[in-house]
């Protein structure tokens, strides 16, 4: 099973009122799409970007076992527009901000629970 995940997050005035959006496309015979949008309160753009990735992984971590889809062997392909988040998650940039470090750890835990 393959999932294509698009995430985005943003804050007005940075920091300011922030929200995240996620679209998860399940590539199979049904090609089901799931959309998640959520206000996350006051945050920076970078916090919102990380939160969107976390929300997508949390959804998949809960969805996969309930659907009988094995966690291991499932392909999850992410698309996001935050170079900072991509580079930090891939270990290319250091995570200096404490809040971003906390969010990155949450993302890494979810990845390991899914089998990534």
Stretches found by the model and what they are:
Residues 1-47, 51, 58-62:
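RNase H-like nuclease fold core
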Residues 10-14, 54-116:
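RNase H catalytic domain
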């Amino acid at each position: 099973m393959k999932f294509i995940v698009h995430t985005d997050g943003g804050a007005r005035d940075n920091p300011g009122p922030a929200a995240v959006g996620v679209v998860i496309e399940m590539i199979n015979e049904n090609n089901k799409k799931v959309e998640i949008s959520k206000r996350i309160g006051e945050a920076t753009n970078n916090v919102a970007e990380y939160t969107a990735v976390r929300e997508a992984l949390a959804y998949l971590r809960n969805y996969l076992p309930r659907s009988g889809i094995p966690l291991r062997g499932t392909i999850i392909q992410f698309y996001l527009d935050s170079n900072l988040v991509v580079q930090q998650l891939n270990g290319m940039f250091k995570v200096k901000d404490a809040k971003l470090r906390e969010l990155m750890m949450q993302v890494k835990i979810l990845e390991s629970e899914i089998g990534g």
